[in-house]
Amino acid sequence: MKLTEKNITLFALTCFVIISTTWLFLNPIQPKEKHIAEIKEGDYVVIKGYIQEMYVKRDKYRHVINISRIVINDGTGNLDVVAFGKTREELLTYILSYNPMIKEGDYIEVKGRVTLYKGKYEIILNNIKDFKLLKKNNFERDIYLSPTPTGIYASKYGKKYHTSKNCPYGKRLKEENIIYFYSEDDAKALGYEKCKWCEEHGG
């Protein structure tokens, strides 16, 4: 092949692309650990902080079946963490793999590119390896509802629970609106108070 200025230029560009690609493969860009107050859009960072809030979807028995957003705080500010598709499914599996599940107060690490969405900074997880529990702080037990009738029940629209099948107030509840608890402690932990009639009549 005759060496011309054009051929030499193309050859040089090809070599540059190959060398650059190889270098990036062998030396991937490393994220920089920062405080939330220091980040800006486009930064590739590692953030460590406490879970402040989790936006989850639960089924009728209170099992978590989806996670839409996690808000973390490191003492300098808040950051939203989101995931989509397969990564969201893997995030849910990871969170539920702990007993009790990962929840508010737990100390975590996230890694990713900072984006801006509706005026808020967020990191979109591209890989479940970019989300890690560093320390479990919240050991409050996970509370679920019973799928079968128990002696402890309430309306899903109220805040009083009943323990007697003869309770005149409990009898007014429509079957489709009744939820059942495994224990009175579960009912109280979810913010329910015992019905006065059941309390007075030993139910």
UniProtKB/Swiss-Prot annotation:
It holds the Pfam family tRNA_anti-codon. Gene3D superfamilies: DNA Methylphosphotriester Repair Domain, Nucleic acid-binding proteins. GO terms for molecular function: nucleic acid binding. InterPro entries: Ada-like_dom_sf, NA-bd_OB-fold, NA-bd_OB_tRNA, UCP021980_OB-fold. SUPFAM superfamilies: Ada DNA repair protein, N-terminal domain (N-Ada 10), Nucleic acid-binding proteins. This is Uncharacterized protein MJ0818. It comes from Methanocaldococcus jannaschii (strain ATCC 43067 / DSM 2661 / JAL-1 / JCM 10045 / NBRC 100440) (Methanococcus jannaschii).
